[in-house]
Regions:
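Polytopic transmembrane helical bundles with strong interfacial aromatic enrichment
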Residues: 1-136
Length: 136
């Protein structure tokens, strides 16, 4: 089994955690939870975290399908593999953990995780894209 297939298996195991996050948001809305319903900053960042988790896991799964076909060295493939699976963890974590306080009116310093995930995603996407073009 290739490392990309193993990584995809691990990513698929994270899907229930994303579902749990969505269920939590639904409960916050249904119960009109104070600290969520009365805090637009928290609502926005929690929603962004949940959305990014789902979309980035799907993007990572698709990218992993192509990684083994790219004209890249094994070491570079390992870096791409790491950098393509880091954003679905880093970015949602940054969105959620930057507004842990129900009274937060702006993100705390943990918002840097969002930027770190974005950089990792850009590096992985461009590197994989170039590797695929070179292989073609």
């Amino acid at each position: 089994m290739s490392r990309s297939v193993e990584t995809a298996g691990v990513l698929l195991i994270t899907v229930p955690a994303i579902e749990f996050g969505g269920l939590s948001l639904l409960k916050f809305m249904a119960a009109r939870t104070p600290g969520y319903m009365d805090n637009p900053m928290r609502q926005g960042l929690f929603r962004a975290g949940h959305a990014h988790a789902g979309v980035l896991v799907l993007l990572a799964l698709v990218a992993l399908l192509y990684l083994d076909e790219a004209a890249l060295s094994d070491g570079v493939k390992d870096v791409v593999r790491l950098f393509i699976v880091a954003p679905p963890i880093l970015m949602p974590a940054g969105f959620f953990f930057s507004v842990t306080s129900p009274a937060a009116d702006r993100p705390n310093k943990l918002i840097w995780l969002v930027y770190a995930g974005a950089v990792a995603l850009a590096v992985a996407a461009v590197t994989l894209g170039v590797g695929l073009l070179r292989a073609g």
